[in-house]
Protein backbone atom coordinates (compact mmCIF):
# COMPACT_ATOMS: atom_id res chain seq x y z
CA UNK A 1 0.00 0.00 0.00
CA UNK A 2 2.82 2.36 0.94
CA UNK A 3 4.46 1.70 -2.46
CA UNK A 4 1.24 2.57 -4.32
CA UNK A 5 0.79 5.77 -2.30
CA UNK A 6 4.41 6.71 -2.95
CA UNK A 7 3.94 6.08 -6.68
CA UNK A 8 0.81 8.23 -6.81
CA UNK A 9 2.62 11.05 -5.01
CA UNK A 10 5.55 10.71 -7.41
CA UNK A 11 3.25 10.93 -10.40
CA UNK A 12 1.57 14.02 -8.96
CA UNK A 13 4.95 15.66 -8.57
CA UNK A 14 6.25 14.42 -11.93
CA UNK A 15 3.21 15.16 -14.08
CA UNK A 16 1.97 18.75 -14.33
CA UNK A 17 -1.74 18.41 -13.59
CA UNK A 18 -3.78 18.79 -16.78
CA UNK A 19 -6.91 19.88 -14.96
CA UNK A 20 -6.78 21.35 -11.49
CA UNK A 21 -10.17 19.98 -10.42
CA UNK A 22 -9.25 16.34 -10.91
CA UNK A 23 -5.61 15.70 -9.94
CA UNK A 24 -6.35 12.57 -7.91
CA UNK A 25 -8.27 10.69 -10.62
CA UNK A 26 -5.80 11.61 -13.32
CA UNK A 27 -2.86 10.76 -11.08
CA UNK A 28 -4.33 7.28 -10.55
CA UNK A 29 -4.54 6.75 -14.32
CA UNK A 30 -1.00 8.03 -14.78
CA UNK A 31 0.26 5.82 -11.94
CA UNK A 32 -1.43 2.73 -13.38
CA UNK A 33 -0.08 3.58 -16.84
CA UNK A 34 3.41 3.94 -15.40
CA UNK A 35 3.13 0.44 -13.94
CA UNK A 36 2.25 -0.84 -17.44
CA UNK A 37 5.25 1.23 -18.62
CA UNK A 38 4.31 1.18 -22.29
CA UNK A 39 1.74 2.32 -24.81
CA UNK A 40 1.64 1.44 -28.52
CA UNK A 41 0.09 3.88 -30.99
CA UNK A 42 -0.30 3.75 -34.76
CA UNK A 43 0.32 7.24 -36.15
CA UNK A 44 0.44 8.97 -39.56
CA UNK A 45 3.59 8.51 -41.67
CA UNK A 46 5.42 11.53 -40.29
CA UNK A 47 9.01 11.25 -39.07
CA UNK A 48 8.67 14.59 -37.27
CA UNK A 49 5.57 13.44 -35.40
CA UNK A 50 7.18 10.14 -34.41
CA UNK A 51 10.32 11.83 -33.10
CA UNK A 52 8.65 14.70 -31.28
CA UNK A 53 5.75 12.69 -29.87
CA UNK A 54 8.13 10.11 -28.45
CA UNK A 55 10.13 12.82 -26.69
CA UNK A 56 7.09 14.76 -25.47
CA UNK A 57 5.10 11.84 -24.06
CA UNK A 58 8.02 9.96 -22.54
CA UNK A 59 9.48 13.17 -21.16
CA UNK A 60 6.20 14.14 -19.52
CA UNK A 61 5.00 10.82 -18.14
CA UNK A 62 8.14 8.67 -17.96
CA UNK A 63 6.40 5.95 -19.98
CA UNK A 64 7.74 4.27 -23.11
CA UNK A 65 5.62 4.96 -26.17
CA UNK A 66 6.05 2.82 -29.27
CA UNK A 67 4.94 4.75 -32.33
CA UNK A 68 4.23 2.87 -35.55
CA UNK A 69 4.35 5.55 -38.25
CA UNK A 70 2.70 4.22 -41.41
CA UNK A 71 -0.11 5.03 -43.84
CA UNK A 72 -3.43 4.73 -42.04
CA UNK A 73 -4.74 1.74 -44.02
CA UNK A 74 -1.55 -0.19 -43.23
CA UNK A 75 -1.96 0.27 -39.48
CA UNK A 76 -5.73 -0.31 -39.61
CA UNK A 77 -5.36 -3.52 -41.63
CA UNK A 78 -2.72 -4.79 -39.23
CA UNK A 79 -4.99 -4.11 -36.26
CA UNK A 80 -7.86 -5.94 -37.97
CA UNK A 81 -5.67 -8.96 -38.74
CA UNK A 82 -4.28 -9.08 -35.21
CA UNK A 83 -7.71 -8.72 -33.62
CA UNK A 84 -9.03 -11.62 -35.68
CA UNK A 85 -6.01 -13.71 -34.65
CA UNK A 86 -6.43 -12.83 -30.98
CA UNK A 87 -3.25 -10.74 -30.91
CA UNK A 88 -3.25 -7.61 -28.75
CA UNK A 89 -0.45 -5.24 -29.70
CA UNK A 90 -1.84 -1.79 -30.54
CA UNK A 91 -3.41 0.43 -27.90
CA UNK A 92 -4.58 3.35 -30.04
CA UNK A 93 -4.54 4.67 -33.58
CA UNK A 94 -4.54 8.10 -35.25
CA UNK A 95 -5.71 8.15 -38.88
CA UNK A 96 -7.51 10.19 -41.52
CA UNK A 97 -11.13 9.97 -42.62
CA UNK A 98 -12.66 6.63 -43.51
CA UNK A 99 -9.58 4.58 -42.66
CA UNK A 100 -10.72 3.13 -39.35
CA UNK A 101 -14.45 2.80 -40.05
CA UNK A 102 -14.12 -0.98 -40.70
CA UNK A 103 -12.57 -1.30 -37.23
CA UNK A 104 -15.49 0.56 -35.67
CA UNK A 105 -18.06 -1.49 -37.56
CA UNK A 106 -16.22 -4.72 -36.77
CA UNK A 107 -16.29 -4.27 -33.01
CA UNK A 108 -12.53 -3.76 -32.85
CA UNK A 109 -12.50 -0.44 -30.98
CA UNK A 110 -13.37 0.76 -27.47
CA UNK A 111 -15.94 3.53 -26.90
CA UNK A 112 -14.17 6.86 -26.50
CA UNK A 113 -16.37 8.73 -24.02
CA UNK A 114 -15.89 6.32 -21.07
CA UNK A 115 -12.15 6.87 -21.55
CA UNK A 116 -12.41 10.67 -21.42
CA UNK A 117 -11.13 11.10 -17.88
CA UNK A 118 -10.40 14.82 -17.99
CA UNK A 119 -13.28 17.28 -17.70
CA UNK A 120 -11.59 19.59 -20.21
CA UNK A 121 -11.70 16.73 -22.73
CA UNK A 122 -15.22 15.52 -21.87
CA UNK A 123 -16.86 18.96 -21.98
CA UNK A 124 -18.29 19.52 -25.49
CA UNK A 125 -18.20 23.28 -24.85
CA UNK A 126 -14.42 23.15 -25.25
CA UNK A 127 -14.78 21.86 -28.80
CA UNK A 128 -15.95 23.82 -31.84
CA UNK A 129 -19.05 21.97 -33.02
CA UNK A 130 -19.19 19.94 -29.79
CA UNK A 131 -18.18 16.30 -29.96
CA UNK A 132 -17.84 15.20 -33.59
CA UNK A 133 -17.59 11.53 -34.45
CA UNK A 134 -16.00 10.05 -37.54
CA UNK A 135 -18.44 7.13 -37.17
CA UNK A 136 -21.40 9.53 -37.16
CA UNK A 137 -24.15 7.36 -38.65
CA UNK A 138 -24.97 4.49 -36.29
CA UNK A 139 -22.33 4.02 -33.61
CA UNK A 140 -21.19 7.60 -32.82
CA UNK A 141 -18.74 6.56 -30.14
CA UNK A 142 -15.62 4.81 -31.43
CA UNK A 143 -13.72 7.38 -33.54
CA UNK A 144 -13.24 10.94 -32.35
CA UNK A 145 -12.60 13.66 -34.96
CA UNK A 146 -10.46 16.39 -33.37
CA UNK A 147 -9.35 18.39 -36.43
CA UNK A 148 -11.43 20.59 -38.73
CA UNK A 149 -9.72 22.75 -41.32
CA UNK A 150 -10.06 24.16 -44.81
CA UNK A 151 -7.47 24.83 -47.48
CA UNK A 152 -5.01 22.00 -46.90
CA UNK A 153 -3.78 20.73 -50.25
CA UNK A 154 -5.64 23.47 -52.06
CA UNK A 155 -5.09 25.31 -55.31
CA UNK A 156 -1.75 26.81 -56.35
CA UNK A 157 -0.57 28.70 -59.43
CA UNK A 158 2.60 29.80 -61.16
CA UNK A 159 2.48 33.59 -61.10
CA UNK A 160 4.30 33.88 -64.44
CA UNK A 161 1.63 31.79 -66.18
CA UNK A 162 -1.66 32.52 -64.40
CA UNK A 163 -3.41 35.25 -62.46
CA UNK A 164 -5.82 34.82 -59.54
CA UNK A 165 -8.51 36.88 -61.26
CA UNK A 166 -8.56 34.27 -64.04
CA UNK A 167 -9.50 31.53 -61.57
CA UNK A 168 -12.29 32.82 -59.37
CA UNK A 169 -14.63 29.87 -59.93
CA UNK A 170 -14.21 26.15 -60.46
CA UNK A 171 -15.72 26.74 -63.89
CA UNK A 172 -12.68 28.82 -64.83
CA UNK A 173 -10.54 25.68 -64.68
CA UNK A 174 -12.37 24.46 -67.80
CA UNK A 175 -10.98 27.32 -69.90
CA UNK A 176 -9.10 25.83 -72.89
CA UNK A 177 -6.21 28.11 -71.94
CA UNK A 178 -5.31 25.67 -69.15
CA UNK A 179 -5.33 22.50 -71.25
CA UNK A 180 -2.21 20.49 -70.48
CA UNK A 181 -1.18 22.97 -67.80
CA UNK A 182 -2.90 21.60 -64.69
CA UNK A 183 -1.70 19.06 -62.15
CA UNK A 184 -3.89 17.01 -59.81
CA UNK A 185 -3.07 14.81 -56.84
CA UNK A 186 -4.49 11.42 -57.82
CA UNK A 187 -8.14 11.29 -56.66
CA UNK A 188 -8.26 7.52 -56.88
CA UNK A 189 -6.41 7.23 -53.57
CA UNK A 190 -7.12 8.92 -50.21
CA UNK A 191 -5.62 12.37 -49.93
CA UNK A 192 -6.05 16.03 -50.75
CA UNK A 193 -6.65 15.38 -54.44
CA UNK A 194 -9.49 13.03 -53.64
CA UNK A 195 -10.95 15.61 -51.27
CA UNK A 196 -10.97 18.34 -53.96
CA UNK A 197 -12.28 15.91 -56.58
CA UNK A 198 -15.08 14.85 -54.22
CA UNK A 199 -16.10 18.46 -53.60
CA UNK A 200 -16.32 19.03 -57.36
CA UNK A 201 -18.29 15.79 -57.75
CA UNK A 202 -20.80 16.92 -55.14
CA UNK A 203 -21.11 20.60 -56.07
CA UNK A 204 -20.51 20.55 -59.84
CA UNK A 205 -21.42 17.03 -60.94
CA UNK A 206 -19.87 14.34 -63.11
CA UNK A 207 -20.18 16.29 -66.36
CA UNK A 208 -17.93 18.95 -64.87
CA UNK A 209 -15.33 16.34 -63.93
CA UNK A 210 -15.46 14.80 -67.40
CA UNK A 211 -14.69 18.22 -68.87
CA UNK A 212 -11.93 18.74 -66.32
CA UNK A 213 -10.29 15.45 -67.31
CA UNK A 214 -10.46 16.53 -70.96
CA UNK A 215 -8.05 19.31 -69.97
CA UNK A 216 -5.28 16.68 -70.11
CA UNK A 217 -4.50 16.78 -66.41
CA UNK A 218 -1.11 15.75 -65.10
CA UNK A 219 -2.20 13.24 -62.44
CA UNK A 220 0.32 11.97 -59.91
CA UNK A 221 0.48 10.43 -56.45
CA UNK A 222 3.82 12.16 -55.89
CA UNK A 223 2.97 15.59 -54.47
CA UNK A 224 6.58 16.71 -54.67
CA UNK A 225 6.56 15.92 -58.40
CA UNK A 226 3.45 18.07 -58.88
CA UNK A 227 4.95 20.97 -56.93
CA UNK A 228 8.24 20.71 -58.81
CA UNK A 229 6.41 20.92 -62.14
CA UNK A 230 4.62 24.10 -61.06
CA UNK A 231 7.82 25.70 -59.76
CA UNK A 232 9.59 24.92 -63.06
CA UNK A 233 6.70 26.45 -65.07
CA UNK A 234 5.79 23.11 -66.63
CA UNK A 235 2.33 23.59 -65.10
CA UNK A 236 0.30 26.75 -64.50
CA UNK A 237 -2.10 25.40 -61.84
CA UNK A 238 -2.06 22.52 -59.38
CA UNK A 239 -4.76 20.90 -57.28
CA UNK A 240 -4.01 18.87 -54.17
CA UNK A 241 -0.38 19.69 -53.35
CA UNK A 242 -0.06 21.75 -50.17
CA UNK A 243 2.12 24.28 -48.43
CA UNK A 244 4.59 21.68 -47.15
CA UNK A 245 5.37 20.67 -50.74
CA UNK A 246 5.73 24.28 -51.90
CA UNK A 247 7.62 25.71 -48.93
CA UNK A 248 11.11 24.92 -50.34
CA UNK A 249 10.21 26.63 -53.61
CA UNK A 250 8.73 29.64 -51.82
CA UNK A 251 11.92 29.96 -49.77
CA UNK A 252 13.91 29.85 -53.01
CA UNK A 253 11.90 32.72 -54.46
CA UNK A 254 10.26 30.68 -57.21
CA UNK A 255 6.92 31.92 -58.64
CA UNK A 256 4.50 29.63 -56.79
CA UNK A 257 1.55 31.09 -54.91
CA UNK A 258 -1.64 29.80 -53.35
CA UNK A 259 -4.86 30.70 -55.11
CA UNK A 260 -7.67 32.30 -53.12
CA UNK A 261 -10.56 29.93 -52.53
CA UNK A 262 -12.94 29.82 -55.51
CA UNK A 263 -16.43 31.15 -55.00
CA UNK A 264 -17.69 27.60 -54.42
CA UNK A 265 -15.24 27.15 -51.52
CA UNK A 266 -12.58 24.57 -50.70
CA UNK A 267 -13.21 21.24 -48.98
CA UNK A 268 -13.20 21.09 -45.21
CA UNK A 269 -11.00 18.30 -43.88
CA UNK A 270 -10.15 16.52 -40.66
CA UNK A 271 -6.68 15.67 -41.96
CA UNK A 272 -4.91 13.12 -39.79
CA UNK A 273 -7.30 13.98 -37.00
CA UNK A 274 -9.23 10.84 -36.03
CA UNK A 275 -8.33 8.87 -32.90
CA UNK A 276 -9.54 5.52 -31.62
CA UNK A 277 -8.66 3.07 -28.84
CA UNK A 278 -8.24 -0.55 -29.89
CA UNK A 279 -10.56 -3.15 -28.32
CA UNK A 280 -9.08 -4.70 -25.17
CA UNK A 281 -5.79 -2.80 -25.44
CA UNK A 282 -2.74 -4.49 -23.87
CA UNK A 283 -2.01 -1.29 -21.92
CA UNK A 284 -5.49 0.05 -21.05
CA UNK A 285 -4.31 2.75 -18.67
CA UNK A 286 -1.60 3.83 -21.08
CA UNK A 287 -4.22 4.05 -23.82
CA UNK A 288 -6.48 6.18 -21.62
CA UNK A 289 -3.58 8.39 -20.57
CA UNK A 290 -2.54 8.92 -24.19
CA UNK A 291 -6.09 9.72 -25.31
CA UNK A 292 -6.61 12.31 -22.58
CA UNK A 293 -3.25 13.95 -23.12
CA UNK A 294 -3.76 14.07 -26.90
CA UNK A 295 -7.20 15.67 -26.56
CA UNK A 296 -6.16 18.05 -23.78
CA UNK A 297 -5.32 21.65 -24.54
CA UNK A 298 -1.63 20.85 -24.21
CA UNK A 299 -1.84 17.80 -26.46
CA UNK A 300 -3.79 19.63 -29.15
CA UNK A 301 -1.33 22.53 -29.14
CA UNK A 302 1.51 20.03 -29.54
CA UNK A 303 -0.15 18.02 -32.31
CA UNK A 304 -1.21 21.12 -34.22
CA UNK A 305 2.29 22.61 -34.18
CA UNK A 306 3.97 19.42 -35.33
CA UNK A 307 1.41 18.49 -37.99
CA UNK A 308 0.45 22.06 -39.00
CA UNK A 309 -3.17 21.09 -38.44
CA UNK A 310 -6.19 22.84 -36.93
CA UNK A 311 -7.68 21.51 -33.73
CA UNK A 312 -11.36 22.00 -32.95
CA UNK A 313 -10.50 23.01 -29.38
CA UNK A 314 -11.70 26.55 -28.76
CA UNK A 315 -8.95 27.31 -26.25
CA UNK A 316 -6.10 26.64 -28.71
CA UNK A 317 -4.91 29.36 -31.08
CA UNK A 318 -4.96 28.28 -34.72
CA UNK A 319 -4.83 31.59 -36.60
CA UNK A 320 -1.07 31.21 -37.15
CA UNK A 321 -1.73 28.29 -39.51
CA UNK A 322 -2.75 30.67 -42.30
CA UNK A 323 0.98 31.14 -42.98
CA UNK A 324 1.07 27.43 -43.87
CA UNK A 325 -1.90 27.54 -46.21
CA UNK A 326 -4.33 26.11 -43.66
CA UNK A 327 -7.29 27.76 -41.99
CA UNK A 328 -9.05 26.36 -38.96
CA UNK A 329 -12.73 25.74 -39.60
CA UNK A 330 -13.48 27.39 -36.26
CA UNK A 331 -11.77 30.59 -37.45
CA UNK A 332 -13.34 30.81 -40.90
CA UNK A 333 -16.54 28.78 -41.26
CA UNK A 334 -19.96 28.49 -39.71
CA UNK A 335 -21.02 24.96 -38.80
CA UNK A 336 -23.45 25.04 -41.73
CA UNK A 337 -20.63 25.94 -44.13
CA UNK A 338 -18.43 23.26 -42.60
CA UNK A 339 -21.07 20.60 -43.16
CA UNK A 340 -21.64 21.84 -46.71
CA UNK A 341 -17.96 21.76 -47.65
CA UNK A 342 -16.77 18.66 -45.82
CA UNK A 343 -16.53 15.26 -47.47
CA UNK A 344 -15.18 13.50 -44.41
CA UNK A 345 -16.97 11.76 -41.52
CA UNK A 346 -18.91 8.59 -42.24
CA UNK A 347 -22.05 10.18 -43.68
CA UNK A 348 -20.20 12.14 -46.37
CA UNK A 349 -17.44 9.57 -46.77
CA UNK A 350 -19.91 6.91 -47.86
CA UNK A 351 -22.23 9.13 -49.93
CA UNK A 352 -19.69 11.50 -51.51
CA UNK A 353 -16.08 10.47 -51.09
CA UNK A 354 -16.38 6.81 -52.09
CA UNK A 355 -18.63 7.29 -55.15
CA UNK A 356 -16.48 10.22 -56.30
CA UNK A 357 -13.38 8.03 -56.03
CA UNK A 358 -15.14 5.26 -57.95
CA UNK A 359 -15.99 7.75 -60.69
CA UNK A 360 -12.33 8.79 -60.83
CA UNK A 361 -11.40 5.14 -61.35
CA UNK A 362 -13.77 5.00 -64.32
CA UNK A 363 -12.59 8.07 -66.19
CA UNK A 364 -8.90 8.30 -65.27
CA UNK A 365 -7.17 5.52 -67.15
Locate predicted features.
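Extracytoplasmic ligand-binding site segments that recognize negatively charged/polar headgroups
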Residues: 40-54, 66-80, 88-227, 231
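Periplasmic-binding protein-like
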Residues: 209-213, 218-220, 253-281, 322-323
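A ligand-binding cleft/hinge motif common to bilobed small-molecule-binding domains
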Residues: 99-102, 237-257
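Short, polar/charged alpha-helical segment
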Residues: 23-34, 38-64
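Conserved C-terminal helix/tail region of periplasmic/extracytoplasmic solute-binding proteins
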Residues: 22, 330-365
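Sec-exported extracytoplasmic/periplasmic mature domains
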Residues: 31-38, 58-63, 80-84, 98, ...
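Mature extracytoplasmic/periplasmic domains
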Residues: 273-340
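Bacterial N-terminal signal peptides
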Residues: 5-17
Amino acid sequence: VRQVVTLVIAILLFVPVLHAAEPADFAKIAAAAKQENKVVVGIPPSADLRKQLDAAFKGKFGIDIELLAAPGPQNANRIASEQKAGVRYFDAIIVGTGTALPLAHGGMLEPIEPNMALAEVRDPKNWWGGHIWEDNLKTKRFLYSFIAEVGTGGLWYNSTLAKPEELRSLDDFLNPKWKGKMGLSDPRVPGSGQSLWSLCWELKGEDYLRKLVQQNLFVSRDLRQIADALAKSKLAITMGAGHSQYEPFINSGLPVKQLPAPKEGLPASNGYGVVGIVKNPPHPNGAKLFLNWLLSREGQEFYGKVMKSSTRRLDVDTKWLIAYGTQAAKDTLTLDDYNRLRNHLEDKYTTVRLPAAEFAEQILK
